[in-house]
Structure formats: structure tokens, C-alpha cells
């Protein structure tokens, strides 16, 4: 295998026994692919598929006017270029979007001619608002903040059959129902009630008998009975005897009420016996086809057809009439020879439709339509037309109703039809088939659906949701356009006069800005970004709500396997409603999640990979990825553990049809980053996956010694690193950019052979953590496409690095690690292991007020020199200034209202022209409890206002940077061009030119003495070479011009003013970098759900140490392991100890300058001789220098990868411990740092990867003396943001009462809270050094009095004089 640039520098030892069949797919594909399908930006408009924007336009257009004389047709659309790039949008608070222009055609028809003759056609491009663009990392920048649109898991359109689980009726009877869910349109429900009648509901309104709907569709009673029932035929003799045409199989299970005999009079079934299969066989053998039945047998049956009097033609009895003795007598009297009844029985053919028809008030189609109209629009008088139109629009109009391709596919599959395509609206057959299937299920044929099955839930991603919103906007436009179209002809309007783009723009903006699924991106670290984009939520518009979601929806379903992670989901009210995609899962064209599988043929595993959705998966027998196989890929076990029909069973190898591709395909990205996941309890693994997302990037990222091999994928796909777009050689590297000269074979004709990567330096993330990129390449090194050139936050040499490897011991230590507390050594603080940088953005806005405009200035009234020392002449703080709470960052003054002046003041004003008192100081100050360094200042000025000195300086610095970049690019292109020219010219004969001799070959020395301009003047003997020289000159000139144009464009953007909100003159943004060291109260965690709060930081000399004098960094409580069942952390510690000790061995060898061969041999022993990994590391392909570099990178430990469900075994860990010279128990004797005595027994010591979580004590704790008070109760406000007090609540009062601490209690409830006079007096007293208090009346008592009075009860306080 080929190693990438970073892999070569540090190889991770992999314990995996199973080969990698398939690379982990690109992790953000679900977002990018979905939005690409929506915009289809790179597809020429004649090749665009019917999806996304294109489909939305096609579904609304053409719009025809009411008169039909004018129509507006859609031709195509084009997306423009974004004005600002992503970084500029974030800085300016703009939305990263492109203008959408739609080409439409207005056609006007001739009114007079009978056939529609076209009178006029106008075509025009119309602006339809802005469409937000997705960045390369799958996010959107909306108003300057990065947002993510989370995919939604919703119920697939189609038809579903279910029952109420016996909850509706007290008897516990199962009531079945069917529901047709369209993609958009009205829901149609059929349901049984406890009396076994069938009802229909439309849009969950009042229920009507189901026969009303069928009648409205145009079916008569007779047709309905014919559709749902078979009939029994009877003959009537003159004497009134009934003869049944016998179908023997129908009798099975009935109890006879009379004897059944054959033709010869032999008894076959006695009276009162149940007819069995044996009886039926006897009847068939005897050839009995007719049976004379008594009248009692007939009573209670229903007629299947209308019975008509042959002579008069009148209807004697309507169909569905129940037969009684009177009816029979009438039939005999009328001379009816034969009639048919409905065949029903108790077992598998109930009389549901027949009974429903009897309860149906409607008799004709019109009555049924009116009944439906009344239910849908109560209170409106129905007319025939309105009732027909309403019903037609409900399910049969493509404008109002759409099942969608998915819905039609699910609908047809569920009803057992062959075709998967069809119309988007319902047909009569569709409705009847749903009802038939429902009745079959009630009759015991067929089963209900499982709505939590992933074959019945589909994923709606960004593109689809954006398309729906866009369509909503277009529908609003359509109404307006229809009305204007009638005027189009008379007033000669153009298409752009007809279309108002505002509704479309508003709908799109609303979706991206404030939809429940458009979320502020979680940007704590690269993993949290990736996880956020791969999240699948069941909440949101058209989804579930937290309160209504029951237990079943939240539970893990067998179909989640390989599609949705069973581990990663939030704790709390959203548990199970928000899920994460499994590592290998993707969505198919219908939006169902599918998972990859290897095909197995005749017990032999092939390399062919097929994706199966949950719908298809159940049919197949699927083996686990870990199933044992030999070299030829044949399954070796006699019985293989397989999944079949969503159950886990055992089958023989020949029956296996598919096999999983990887053991980690079950879990999500975050869970696959937990080493030894298979040894952790699921609840703790859930916490582990969730807490990794909260890890704050540390100052120096450090790769995990014990990882899982997924770290590389996450770092590369997250988009926080700089990845080489094309291979080449590193031309230059500095802190802010990397310049790559692209390899010749990757340069396309006529483009620059240079890639410049500007690094992001110290910028703020959404969570106020620090985003910083550091280059890891050196000048002159070769890189290939896809290599990582610079590490982002929490990335170390191209691997995700969320925390630090700490030396840990499991032991109690004087109660300091009681209940998950963590004891930390001071060394951790000194080495800045968990020091993090947080960046805060503070904004100062100067507005136009009624009294005049605010001004940003250094001239602030009543402020001393000291406070202004950090401001420049514009009143803005210097970059690099260290500021603490209360310091002024931006000086700002606001005009004050004119107050009435005394005559004396007026006189002074008149004499001295004193004007300073009419402004007040509203400067931006550093908030309380914040201390940091100013790292950046941005000034935005409204267009048309003069910029201050500071903005001009910032602008100049930015322009210099751009100019420098462009010059660099030109220099490299120029260098490459002249290199190619030199190669072409040297050794060939010259004709004319400066410094060349005619007829002599050109040499390197000749060229070196010429200036570059003179090179172009050389003429050669060979015309081909002359053309090459000319082409090079033209190409360089063009490049220069292009770069100048680019510079002018950027300059123009910088120099124009900014588009600020109305009334805003200037915005100053100050960025503060705050350094947070670790301290007691901060929350830390491992990757196995083992979290805790730091209780104390102990000096190094007090910490326990081993025989070599190495102190422990962190002491954890051993009682945190057994009850939590996350043993993975213990294994991680053992393997970490082995990794570290091997690193120390390598370090020793390097210090002793051992031969390279010896080091190579030791590395080979580590990588290739311990464990049964499926792949050997090819150390022979490394040069000696590369081996030394690799060894140098392994000095602080050899990184290991132990994958989920395919990790290191105990034996392998012991071998590595032994190789590193450690006891294979992983335990050692420790000594007490304070006394020097050894502890009683050996202690488990090792290295664990610890994370510092974004729950820092600095953000949570504050102290207040005096501050703001609530308006009504006059009690101090609560919360850190309001600088509030500590609540002394009900239970705390009880505690003081229990102690009888009366004075303390009085103080708490009066002067420390809401006794206004008392607290002011107290403040004065303390200032005077007098510590007495005089409690008065608490304000809340007055509030109570007022509330009682508001109830109409007079209450007064009597005071003793």
C-alpha cells in the first residue's frame, strides 16, 4: 500500500484482523450531494434532471391567466457568481449566496380566432432572489454565522395499515385502520369502530361511513357489494323450499343447524356438529352440488342484487336487504325462482361493508358529495358544482395532491402490485384496493405495518427541504402572476413586471434563517462539525414533537443496523429522536437509508459491493463482517451467525447471500472513535460519543496513543485542515500561507501551475473556541493530491486529536477523587497541557439617534488618561493590547437630551462655549470576569461616510497582503515559464537576438546574462521554437493582466462602504483572545463516558510516583469502573502504557545513536511481529532518512489503532507490555509523594486520553455584591448574564429556620434582598465602617398585598405609632 505524506511520518499500529474491503466514504457526502442535486449548478440547462429547482419551476409553470389568453412559461434558470467569498461573508455578517435568474417566456394568444393562434411572444430573464450556496464543508453562511441544515427522518409517503393495540375500547378489541399519506395533500384514513363498521376520515376530521366515499366515487350499492363479497346462490321452489348451490369448501368451520345427507339419503354431517375438512372431502366425493336448507338458515343473510318484479319492473327488495321470514314469503309469492345472498362468515369474511352500507344515510352520488362537503366546510351552503370541485381537488388534482415517486412506489408495493411507478394522484382503484386490503387484514389475511421500520421512514436532506420551501414561495408568486396576466396584453407588460420575487426570497430566507432544522453549527472541534452534519432528526416541520413521541419511536430498531447508530443520541428529552448516520450509510434515490454489503456466492465471499435498503434487506441472509473465512474467501464455520428477516439466527455457509463490509458499519463516526468500544456498556459509550463533541481544542494538539484508525478520516473530511488540491512541490511555507508549485502532469493547459493556500489564523468559531491552522510541510517536499498540508484545530499530523495523553493511576487519594472527582498534578498546568484559547467577539455599534448621531472617538467626557491609554486617535483599542474587565475597547459618545439650564450655566456657556456636557459616555468596555489580548479589530463604515484613520490602516494592510499573494503567484508562473523556455532553447541554434551568436547553439550562460524581456526577443532557427517563445510571452502578459484585474476587483470591494442595517453608521468589532488554564471546577472526561470535575490541583511533589521517580499526572477513583461497566478505559490504560514504553525504548535507541538497521528491526518487531493484523507495514520501502524521521515522531509513544469490534486482544497487549519492558499485569508499586512510603498494593498505571470539555468554571461562576434588581419585586436578578445574585430559596429558608438562626434569616430576607431602604442604608453604613443593619419592609410584601387586593379582598397594614 502507498503511504500518504502524513502516514509516512507516523504509522499507527493496527490490530485489525479483518481486511479493509471498502474505504470509509466521504463523511459529508449526504449534505453536499443533496444540495448539488438541488441547484444542479454545474449541469448545462438542457441536461438538467427533473429535481431540485428545475422540478420546482416545472411544477408551477406554465401559469395561464384566468381568461386563458396569456401564459407564462418557464425556459431555464442560471445561477450567478457570489459577490463575497465565504470568509468575507463571515466577517461582514453577510449571507453567502448567488443571484438566481430565471428565463421565462410570456405568450399572448389571439382572442378573436377560434383556434388558439399565438399573437405575441416575449422572453426575458427575471431576477428571483438569492439562493444561499453551500460551502465546500457542507455548511451555509447566513448573516455571517455558519449554519447546518440537519436532515430529517420522517414518515415515508404511501399507505400504512395499523391497529390501536386495543387501547381505544375497554374490551381490548383491536381496531384496524389504514392511512394514505401523500407527500403533499390531504390524508385519507379508513378505520374500524368497535361495532365493526368501516369509517373514513379526511385530514383527521369528523368520520363518515366509508361507503360515502365509495358512493362519491360513483359506485352503487350493488357494485360495492360485488367488489367486496362473493355470493351464495339459492333457488326457490313453488312450495317455498330453498335450495343452496353448494360450494363445499365454504362450509368449513360452520356449525350445522340441520342434517346434511347425500343423494342416496346417507347421513354425512349430523345436526349441531362443526364441519371439518373430512366432512368436506366426503361431500365432494359424494358429488353433492345442491342442498335443501330450512328457512332458519336463510334468515339474517343479505341480498346481493336488487330483486326486480319481472312483470311490473319495480324493485321488490333492494340489495343488502336482510332476509326475514316475511321477505322469503314475499319472494315466493312474487314467483322469484332464484336469488343471491352475500357470503359472509365469522371466521374470515366479515359483513363489515354490508353493515356499513346500512348505516349510510346517502343514497346517491350527489348526496355523498354533499355530505363530504359539509364535513370539510361546515356551515357553508353546498351547491352541486362546489361539492364536485372540492371532492375532485382532494385526491385527484395534481396541483393539490402529490404522492411523489416514493409514495407511489411504497403504495404499489404495499398493495402487492407489480409496477413501481404510476400517477402522483389517487385513482378509484387505489382507494378501493386500500379498503380491500384493510378488510383482508381485519379478516385475518395479512399483517399490519411497523411504522418504526426504516423502510417506512425516509430521510429528507437539505436539497429536498430547500426545494419544498422554494415551491411554497413560487405558489405565492403564482397567485399574483395569474391576476396580473390578464392585464399583460392590454398594458404591454414584460415578464419582469409580472413576477415579484419577494415571496420566493422570503420563503428561502425564512427556511435558512429560522427553520427548526437550520441550526447554528456546533463548531467546538472537527468531530462536532462532522457529527452535526451527519445528524438525522425526527423533529422539525412535518415530523414528530418531543411531547407526542412515544417509547417505540425512540427505541433501537433491528433495521437501524448499519444505517443509524444505536449508540449516539442525546441524553434527555430528545433521546432517540435525534440520531446519527452510521459510518457507511447513505441515502438512495428515494431517500431511504441503505448500507453496503459484500455479495456471497455459494459460500464464497466476493469483492462485489451492493447497497441494500431496509426494504430489501429482510429478504436476504446476511453474515457479520467478522465471519471466519480462509484465504480464498470461503466461509469456514459450519454455522454462521446471520441476520434474516430482521432476526439473528444461525445458517450454513451455502445459504449466506451477503456479508457486512466492516464491523464498524454498525456505529457512527463519534462512536467509532472510542477504542475498545466492545468492552463498554452502551449507556457509557453514548456519553463517551457525546462528550467527544464537547472537547475544547487544546493549545498543542496531541494525537491519541490509543486510537481506532478513524482519526485520519475525520480530520481529512471535516474541512478544518488544508488538503492539497493537486500534487506538486512545496515552493514556500510561512505561518500564514503555503505555496505549491503544481506537478506538470496535473496542470491543465492555460492555467497557473501554482496553488496558494492561505491559512486561517486565530479566528473565532461559533462556540468561541480558536480556529488556527499550522503548516506541517517543509519547503522542497513533494506532496500528492489529497495530502494534508496544514493541521487545523484539534488535529495533529493529519489525525484528529481532541485531548492529551495523560499518565493516570487508579487509586483513592485522601477523598479528593470521591464521586468522580479528579485529582490533577500541577505539572499539567505548568506544561500547558490543557490550556485552551477562547476568542470573544465584542461589537460596538454607532447609530443615528433622534438627538444626533453617536460618534466613535477617543474624546470621552469624565474619563482619565489611564483609561484611554490603550486607544488610538480614532478611539479604537490597539491590536496586542492586554485588557481586563472594565477597560475601554472602543470610545463612543451619545448625544444627551437638552436639559433646562440655570441662568448661571447659560452665562458660563455663552462665555466659554462649553459643549462637553451634552454627550454621555457609552463606550464598549470589556465585560466582567474577562481578561485577554486584543488580536484583531474590524471596522465597517456605512457607504458614503468618510472612513477614519483606523479603517484606512486596516484596508491598506489587507491590500498589501492581496498584492503579495498575487505577486507570489506571478513569480512562480514566471519561473515555471522560463524553466520550460530554457529547456527548449538550450542547445538549439539561434538566429538573432541580444547576446546570442548567429548560427551558434544557445547555452545556459548566455541566457543567465540576459534580462527576461530579452529572452522573448531571441529568434531561433526553428520556427516551432519561435512560436513557443511568442506563446510564452503572450501567456505571461495575459496572466499579469488577469492578476491585476483580480487585484482591482478586491480593492474595489474593500474601498466601497459596507451595507449596514438602517440607522447604523459604523460597526467596530474587537476580537479578544482569552487564555484559560485548567483549574478546579473544570469538567474533564475520557472517551468511555468517564467524566468528572477537577477537585484540586496538587503540587508535583505530593503526587504518587513510581520506582523511577515518574510522578502521576491524574489520579482517578477506581470505584468509577465496576458499576459503570466501561472496562474499555482500563484496557486503554494498559495499551497506552505499552505504547508509551515502546516510545521510550525508541527514544533511548536514538539517543544512543544505534544503527538504522537496528531501529528498523525494532520497528518491524512492533508493527509486524506482534498481533495478527491483516496487513503488514511495508517498512522496507522506507529510506533510512524516513525511518529516522518516523522513529523521531514515535519518541513520545507508538500510536495504536484498536477498531470497534475488531480490536486488540489481551494477549497482544501483554506482548507489547513485555516488549516495552513493563510488567504484563499493567500494575506497579507507587510511592506516596508526601511521605515517600510505598502504597500497600500495586496500582494500575497507564496512559489514558483525557479531554477538557467546554463546561468551564470561568463561564459558570461569578460573584455579586450589588447590581441590577427586578422591576416588580425589587429582588436581585438571577444568572451570570444579568450579573445576578444567588437564589436563597424556600428550602434554604427552612434550613435557617431549623437552626433557629433568626437574625441571619432576617438579614437574608430583607437587606440582602428586597428591602430597598434597608439595603441603601446598609451600603452607607458599611462605607462608614459601621456594620449595623436596620431591616425594613420587604418590597415583595407590598406585591403580595397588591395581589390580594386584586382578588377583591381589602388588606391593610396597621402600624403602631
Curated annotation (Swiss-Prot):
Keywords, ordered alphabetically: DNA-directed RNA polymerase, Nucleotidyltransferase, Transcription, Transferase
Keyword Lipid biosynthesis attached: no
Protein's UniProt keywords contain Transcription: yes
Function of the protein: DNA-dependent RNA polymerase catalyzes the transcription of DNA into RNA using the four ribonucleoside triphosphates as substrates.
SUPFAM superfamilies assigned: beta and beta-prime subunits of DNA dependent RNA-polymerase
Organism of provenance: Saccharophagus degradans (strain 2-40 / ATCC 43961 / DSM 17024)
Pfam families reported in the protein's UniProt record: RNA_pol_Rpb2_1, RNA_pol_Rpb2_2, RNA_pol_Rpb2_3, RNA_pol_Rpb2_45, RNA_pol_Rpb2_6, RNA_pol_Rpb2_7
Catalytic activity entry: RNA(n) + a ribonucleoside 5'-triphosphate = RNA(n+1) + diphosphate
Descriptive protein name: DNA-directed RNA polymerase subunit beta
Disulfide links within the chain: none
Quaternary structure note: The RNAP catalytic core consists of 2 alpha, 1 beta, 1 beta' and 1 omega subunit. When a sigma factor is associated with the core the holoenzyme is formed, which can initiate transcription.
Xref: PROSITE patterns: RNA_POL_BETA
Amino acid at each position: 500500500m502507498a503511504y500518504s505524506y502524513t502516514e509516512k511520518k507516523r504509522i499507527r499500529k493496527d490490530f485489525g484482523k479483518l481486511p479493509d474491503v471498502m474505504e470509509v466514504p466521504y463523511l459529508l457526502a449526504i449534505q453536499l450531494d443533496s444540495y448539488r442535486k438541488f441547484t444542479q449548478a454545474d449541469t448545462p440547462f438542457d441536461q438538467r434532471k427533473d429535481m431540485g429547482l428545475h422540478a420546482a419551476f416545472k411544477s408551477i409553470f406554465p401559469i395561464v391567466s384566468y381568461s386563458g389568453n396569456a401564459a407564462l412559461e418557464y425556459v431555464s434558470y442560471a445561477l450567478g457568481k457570489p459577490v463575497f467569498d465565504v470568509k468575507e461573508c463571515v466577517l461582514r455578517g453577510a449571507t453567502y449566496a448567488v443571484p438566481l435568474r430565471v428565463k421565462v417566456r410570456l405568450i399572448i394568444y389571439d382572442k378573436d380566432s377560434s383556434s388558439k393562434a399565438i399573437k405575441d411572444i416575449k422572453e426575458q430573464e427575471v431576477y428571483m432572489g438569492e439562493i444561499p450556496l453551500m460551502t465546500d464543508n457542507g455548511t451555509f453562511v447566513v448573516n455571517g454565522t455558519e449554519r447546518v441544515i440537519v436532515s430529517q427522518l420522517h414518515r415515508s409517503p404511501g399507505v400504512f395499515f395499523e391497529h390501536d393495540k386495543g387501547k381505544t375500547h375497554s374490551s381490548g378489541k383491536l381496531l384496524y385502520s389504514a392511512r394514505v399519506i401523500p407527500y403533499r395533500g390531504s390524508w385519507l384514513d379508513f378505520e374500524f369502530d368497535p361495532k365493526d363498521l368501516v369509517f373514513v376520515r379526511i385530514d383527521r376530521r369528523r368520520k363518515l361511513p366509508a361507503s360515502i366515499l365509495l358512493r362519491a366515487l360513483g359506485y352503487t350499492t350493488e357494485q360495492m357489494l360485488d367488489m367486496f363479497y362473493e355470493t351464495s346462490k339459492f333457488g326457490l321452489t313453488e312450495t317455498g323450499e330453498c335450495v343452496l348451490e353448494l360450494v363445499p369448501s365454504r362450509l368449513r368451520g360452520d356449525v350445522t343447524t340441520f342434517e346434511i345427507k347425500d343423494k342416496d339419503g346417507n347421513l354425512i354431517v349430523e345436526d349441531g356438529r362443526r364441519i371439518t375438512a373430512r366432512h368436506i372431502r366426503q361431500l365432494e366425493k359424494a358429488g353433492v352440488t345442491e342442498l335443501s336448507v330450512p328457512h332458519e338458515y336463510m334468515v339474517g343473510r343479505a341480498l346481493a342484487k336488487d330483486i326486480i318484479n319481472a312483470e311490473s319492473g319495480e324493485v321488490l327488495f333492494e340489495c343488502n336487504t336482510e332476509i326475514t321470514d316475511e321477505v322469503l314469503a314475499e319472494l315466493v309469492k312474487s314467483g322469484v325462482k332464484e336469488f343471491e345472498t352475500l357470503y359472509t362468515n365469522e371466521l374470515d369474511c366479515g359483513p363489515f361493508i354490508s353493515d356499513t352500507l346500512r348505516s349510510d344515510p346517502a343514497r346517491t352520488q350527489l348526496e355523498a358529495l354533499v355530505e363530504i362537503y359539509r364535513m370539510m366546510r361546515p356551515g357553508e351552503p353546498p351547491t352541486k358544482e362546489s361539492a364536485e370541485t372540492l371532492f375532485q381537488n382532494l385526491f385527484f388534482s395534481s396541483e393539490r395532491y402529490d404522492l411523489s415517486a416514493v409514495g407511489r412506489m411504497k403504495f404499489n408495493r404495499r398493495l402487492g402490485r407489480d409496477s413501481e411507478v404510476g400517477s402522483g394522484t389517487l385513482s378509484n382503484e387505489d382507494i378501493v384496493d386500500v379498503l380491500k386490503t384493510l378488510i383482508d387484514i381485519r379478516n385475518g389475511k395479512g399483517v399490519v405495518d411497523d411504522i418504526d421500520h426504516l423502510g417506512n421512514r425516509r430521510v429528507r436532506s437539505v436539497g429536498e427541504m430547500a426545494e419544498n420551501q422554494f415551491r411554497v414561495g413560487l405558489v405565492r408568486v403564482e397567485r399574483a402572476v395569474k391576476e396580473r396576466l390578464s392585464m399583460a396584453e392590454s398594458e404591454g407588460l414584460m415578464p419582469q413586471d409580472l413576477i415579484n420575487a419577494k415571496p420566493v426570497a422570503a420563503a428561502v430566507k425564512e427556511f435558512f434563517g429560522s427553520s427548526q432544522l437550520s441550526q447554528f453549527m456546533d463548531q467546538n472541534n472537527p468531530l462536532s462539525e462532522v457529527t452535526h452534519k451527519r445528524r438525522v432528526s425526527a423533529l422539525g416541520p412535518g415530523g414528530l414533537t418531543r411531547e407526542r413521541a412515544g417509547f417505540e419511536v425512540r427505541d433501537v430498531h433491528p433495521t437501524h443496523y448499519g444505517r443509524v447508530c444505536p449508540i449516539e443520541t442525546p441524553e434527555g428529552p430528545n433521546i432517540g429522536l435525534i440520531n446519527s448516520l452510521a459510518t457507511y450509510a447513505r441515502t438512495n434515490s428515494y431517500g431511504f437509508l441503505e448500507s453496503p454489503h459484500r455479495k456471497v456466492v455459494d459460500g464464497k465471499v466476493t469483492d462485489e459491493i451492493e447497497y441494500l435498503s431496509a426494504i430489501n434487506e429482510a429478504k436476504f441472509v446476511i453474515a457479520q463482517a467478522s465471519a471466519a473465512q480462509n484465504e480464498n474467501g470461503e466461509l469456514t464455520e459450519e454455522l454462521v451467525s446471520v441476520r434474516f428477516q430482521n432476526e439473528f439466527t444461525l445458517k450454513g455457509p451455502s445459504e449466506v447471500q451477503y456479508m457486512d463490509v466492516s464491523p464498524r458499519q454498525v456505529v457512527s463516526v463519534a462512536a467509532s472513535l472510542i477504542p475498545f468500544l466492545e468492552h463498554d456498556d452502551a449507556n457509557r459509550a453514548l456519553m463517551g460519543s457525546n462528550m467527544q463533541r464537547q472537547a475544547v481544542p487544546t493549545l498543542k494538539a496531541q494525537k491519541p496513543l490509543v486510537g481506532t484508525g478513524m482519526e485520519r478520516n475525520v480530520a481529512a473530511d471535516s474541512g478544518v485542515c488544508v488538503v492539497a488540491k493537486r500534487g506538486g512541490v512545496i515552493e514556500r511555507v510561512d505561518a500564514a500561507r503555503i505555496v505549491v508549485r503544481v506537478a506538470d502532469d496535473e496542470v491543465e493547459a492555460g492555467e497557473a501551475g501554482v496553488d496558494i493556500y492561505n491559512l486561517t489564523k486565530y479566528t473565532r468559531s461559533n462556540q468561541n473556541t480558536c480556529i488556527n491552522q499550522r503548516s506541517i510541510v517543509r519547503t522542497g517536499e513533494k506532496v500528492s493530491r489529497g495530502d494534508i498540508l496544514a493541521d487545523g484545530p484539534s488535529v495533529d499530523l493529519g489525525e484528529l486529536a481532541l485531548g492529551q495523553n495523560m499518565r493516570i493511576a487508579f487509586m483513592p487519594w485522601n477523598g479528593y477523587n470521591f464521586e468522580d472527582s479528579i485529582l490533577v498534578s500541577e505539572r499539567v498546568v505548568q506544561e500547558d497541557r490543557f490550556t485552551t484559547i477562547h476568542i470573544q467577539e465584542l461589537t460596538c455599534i454607532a447609530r443615528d439617534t433622534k438627538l444626533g448621531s453617536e460618534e466613535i472617538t477617543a474624546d470621552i467626557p469624565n474619563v482619565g488618561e489611564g483609561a484611554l491609554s490603550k486607544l488610538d486617535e480614532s478611539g479604537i483599542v490597539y491590536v496586542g493590547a492586554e485588557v481586563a474587565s472594565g477597560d475601554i475597547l472602543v470610545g463612543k459618545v451619545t448625544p444627551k437630551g437638552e436639559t433646562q439650564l440655570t441662568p448661571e450655566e447659560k452665562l458660563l456657556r455663552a462665555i466659554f462655549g462649553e459643549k462637553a456636557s451634552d454627550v454621555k459616555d457609552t463606550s464598549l468596555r470589556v465585560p466582567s470576569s474577562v481578561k485577554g489580548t486584543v488580536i484583531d479589530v474590524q471596522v465597517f463604515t456605512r457607504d458614503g461616510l468618510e472612513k477614519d484613520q483606523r479603517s484606512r490602516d486596516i484596508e491598506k494592510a489587507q491590500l498589501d497582503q492581496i498584492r503579495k499573494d498575487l505577486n507570489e503567484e506571478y513569480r512562480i508562473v514566471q519561473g515555471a515559464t522560463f524553466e520550460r523556455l530554457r529547456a527548449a532553447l538550450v542547445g538549439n541554434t539561434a538566429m538573432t537576438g541580444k547576446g546570442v551568436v548567429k548560427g551558434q547553439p544557445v547555452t545556459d550562460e548566455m541566457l543567465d546574462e540576459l534580462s527576461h524581456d530579452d529572452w522573448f526577443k531571441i529568434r531561433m532557427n526553428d520556427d516551432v521554437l519561435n512560436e513557443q517563445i511568442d506563446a510564452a510571452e503572450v501567456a505571461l502578459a495575459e496572466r499579469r493582466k488577469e492578476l491585476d484585474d483580480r487585484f482591482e476587483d478586491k480593492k474595489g470591494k474593500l474601498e466601497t462602504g459596507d451595507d449596514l442595517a438602517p440607522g447604523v453608521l459604523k460597526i467596530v468589532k474587537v476580537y479578544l483572545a482569552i487564555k484559560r488554564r485548567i483549574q478546579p471546577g473544570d469538567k474533564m472526561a475520557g472517551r468511555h463516558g468517564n467524566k468528572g470535575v477537577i477537585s484540586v490541583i496538587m503540587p508535583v511533589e505530593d503526587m504518587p510516583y513510581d520506582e523511577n521517580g515518574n510522578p502521576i499526572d491524574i489520579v482517578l477513583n477506581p470505584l468509577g469502573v465496576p458499576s459503570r461497566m466501561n472496562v474499555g478505559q482500563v484496557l486503554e490504560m494498559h495499551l497506552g502504557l505499552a505504547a508509551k514504553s515502546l516510545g521510550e525504548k525508541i527514544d533511548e535507541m536514538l539517543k544512543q545513536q544505534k544503527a538504522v538497521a537496528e531501529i528498523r528491526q525494532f520497528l518491524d518487531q512492533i508493527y509486524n511481529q506482534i498481533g495478527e493484523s491483516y496487513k503488514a507495514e511495508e517498512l522496507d520501502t522506507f529510506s533510512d532518512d524516513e525511518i529516522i524521521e518516523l522513529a523521531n515522531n514515535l519518541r513520545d509513544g507508538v500510536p495504536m489503532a484498536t477498531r470497534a469490534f475488531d480490536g486488540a486482544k489481551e494477549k497482544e497487549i501483554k506482548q507489547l507490555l513485555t516488549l516495552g519492558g513493563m510488567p504484563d499485569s499493567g500494575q506497579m508499586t507507587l510511592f506516596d509523594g508526601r511521605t515517600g512510603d510505598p502504597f500497600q498494593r500495586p496500582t494500575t498505571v497507564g496512559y489514558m486520553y483525557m479531554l477538557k470539555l467546554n463546561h468551564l468554571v470561568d463561564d459558570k461562576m461569578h460573584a455579586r455584591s450589588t447590581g441590577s434588581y427586578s422591576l416588580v419585586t425589587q429582588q436581585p436578578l438571577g444568572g451570570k448574564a444579568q450579573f445576578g445574585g444567588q437564589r436563597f430559596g424556600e428550602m434554604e429558608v427552612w434550613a435557617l429556620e431549623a437552626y433557629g438562626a433568626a437574625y441571619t434569616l432576617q438579614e437574608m430576607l430583607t437587606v440582602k434582598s428586597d428591602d430597598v431602604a434597608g439595603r441603601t442604608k446598609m451600603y452607607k453604613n458599611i462605607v462608614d465602617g459601621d456594620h449595623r443593619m436596620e431591616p425594613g419592609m420587604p418590597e415583595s410584601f407590598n406585591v403580595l398585598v397588591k395581589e390580594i387586593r386584586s382578588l377583591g379582598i381589602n388588606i391593610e397594614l396597621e402600624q403602631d405609632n
